Amino acid sequence: MFNRKRRGDFDEDENYRDFRPRMPKRQRIPPVVQLCKEMMPDIRTIGESVKAFEDDIKFLSEAIMNEYGHEDYFNNALLSTLNAVVVEQPQKQAAIALLTMVVNSKNNVAGKSIINYFFEELQKWCKQTYNDEFKSTSNETGPWNKIKLILRFLSILSPMFLVDELINIYKSLFELSIELNNLDPGNRVPLSEAIYTNTLLNIPYLFFFNRNNDGLRTKVEELLAYVEQNYLVKTTDINLLREYNGEPPYEMVELVRVVLPNVKKALINNLEQLNELFPDWNHLLTPQTGDEGFNDALTLPSVDDLKSFVRLNKNFGSVDSMWKTPRYAFHVYLPNSAGNFETVVPISTYAGQLFNDIIIDLVESLEFNRKEVARQVITLDLFFKAGIFTEPGESIAQLIATYEENPLAPTFKIEDLAIETILGLIFKLPSVSQPFAYFYTLLVDICQNSPKAIAPVFGRAFRFFYSHLDSLDFELKLRYLDWFSIQMSNFNFSWKWNEWEDDSIKFGKYFYNPKVNFAKNLIQKELRLTSNFSEVEDSLPQEFTKYLDTSYIPRDQLINYYQSLFTGYTVEEDSVRKNDLYFRQEGVPMENTVRKILDYTHKANNSREVTELESILGELKNEYGSIISDFNRFVIILLVQAVTDSGSRSLSHANKYINDLKEDLKTIFAKIELDIETKEYIIIEAVLTFWNANPQTGFLVADAFKYAGLLTSRTIFTFIFNETGLKNNGLIEATAIEAVFRNLSQQISEENESGNNFEFVFERLCTIANSTIDLLDVNADEDIEIPKVNGEMDIDDIEDDKLDLKWKYFTVIGFIKSILRRYSHEYRELADKFIANIDNAIPHESTRRTISNWIQETKEV
């Protein structure tokens, strides 16, 4: 116990109170504040308990009716909470609307205040659509997306309004979208498509509580007829945005093309589809007068106001920015992979498009609360009619059995729908709306919440992408690799590797096979994500243990590299150790001199003199120059590896030593009579040779040498794309590819690099493509087909001496496609130059035609 004295113990000391520290009195929370602390969380979670929903509506509405209008604190807290739910958790809008209408029927002042507040919010966001000073936060979905969500909420409140009040807003928005669309009759206008699609998607919500209003139905039919007649949906096919090369596993569907048919189908047959989608809460709805109107007409921005904003390229919010390029539906869970039924509500239905829209809004607007997003997306079904989805966690085997017994039984899985939509955000081209880490960790959270239900869903997605690796976009392979590796590292590196054994056995001898390289990169990435080598090793069957070698170049090449530095001296293989300085190993002739150099690198900045280093190098030359084949090259390698070794504890240490010693290195290197390009190539070769077993660190250390002014990005690219025989690590090694993207991205914000690295990388890749085509020995007018092989085929059926060359060709072509798309703004400026020279640059016709098309498309992405 705490051995505290009782009050009586102080009775003898009458003055003890004078010395007791004076504590401030505990502040009493005002009743209205306490009420808000209890009530607002209940509003935010409304509808999450189906059983308590009716009671929640009753109790919350009574509290609001009684309290609204008395205290500004309560009024403001209520309105801001309602707004937060409406724009951050759109699946709950109908519940909030029901609550609002029940309140309105008994306290019209409160009801009117709520609709006025949301109308003002709508007007506020309309003004923000053309505000050049608009600042977007990470969870900002955009002004137009906010307009969509607020209009949807007001639409659910249709029983409160005169019919024309809402119809006029719809009409104005459609008129604006049509005017914007007509600004450029030959090309898509992103903002026009966003307004058109968003507004159409809201129309069925007018009938949520108002399904028997014939006047409303007539007005909506007239509105849809007007839109269909006056809005031209433009055909867009941007190959750069295709997720697959060649034949995709599913039809590419553009959201703007399906929204009107989806809405029309939802409204026919006496709203049959809506009756199956929306829950029937009319028994909870209290009578509404239906005569409400807004105080003012909504003022939309004019076409002139919006002319500089129609491309949606000003970073006005994550969802609004998605419309910058055509928006396609993304699929993972196809019917033929699960049986003769679908587990995801088709995008060709109103429900499918709406669910897709809601999940995206949830994921984007609640980005600041990832744990909440993980919970919400899997419980989306609570806010729609029961029976649309199967029971959570039901396996595909159970579904197949149920479906065979009863073809009318539900087969849609909320888990599949949520995961597929989030994967669509991860695999979105040309860029993603949030950092990848957010999406990856969100999926980890979802799986951790219910691993038995979600793990099989992930497994089916892993298998889907793996089965299409031959045609999956080059950049998307890297995203798939990242996602897969992060999921595995969070779940004990558990995977059914035996499923891939046949592919490894049959294609392991090929350098460019996509599936073998994926497995290799995956295992090596797993090793980088853990310090426990055996944890990964123990998870692998024997066939895959050969991929545990993380070396950038093979061991024999590494030995030859060091041997090339000497004449009359043989390098002992045991002396070449992983991530260690070879030159200080016991038995290496200049070991003691090298230790002097290492002592020099560790000296404090104010106690180092470069003349001391020069003296040590002079000593080295005098004593060992006779066994060194090229002393200039040797000095560069030795000094670079000595500095690299000194900073090998961490990247921060590497940066420190490189920055501390950069001037000394520059002084020494300046006296070496080699051209700059040769010196730089020797530097990066020395770095990657030291870090051969950990090339990711090697490339990051090379970046540090670049920032120190000892290296350029161009030399890094030259090294990465150097070929040994037909083998080019820069095309298949994930860390090298990441280094290419990283250095190109860095140049966008750097002005210190001379020359155009974007042009250099493009031309280097085209050169690799041309040499590969020459080796394939195809005619100029002959197409090259993606190899159609798999691990189930007999080995005799797939013998093809040019199989690896074909994979190499499609790898390098995919790389070209990725850089043109990823850096479209930079390549747009080079487009005319490329096109003018492309006939000579790329002789092969179909390759030239494909790349020419991509170059032209950079203007559209």
From Swiss-Prot:
SMART domains according to UniProt: MIF4G (SM00543)
Boundaries of every MIF4G domain copy: 36-264
Motif Nuclear localization signal location, chain numbering: 22-30
GO biological process, one term: mRNA export from nucleus
One GO cellular component term noted in the UniProt record for this chain: perinuclear region of cytoplasm
Keyword Nucleus in annotation: yes
Keyword Chloroplast: no
The protein's name: Nuclear cap-binding protein complex subunit 1
Underlying gene: STO1
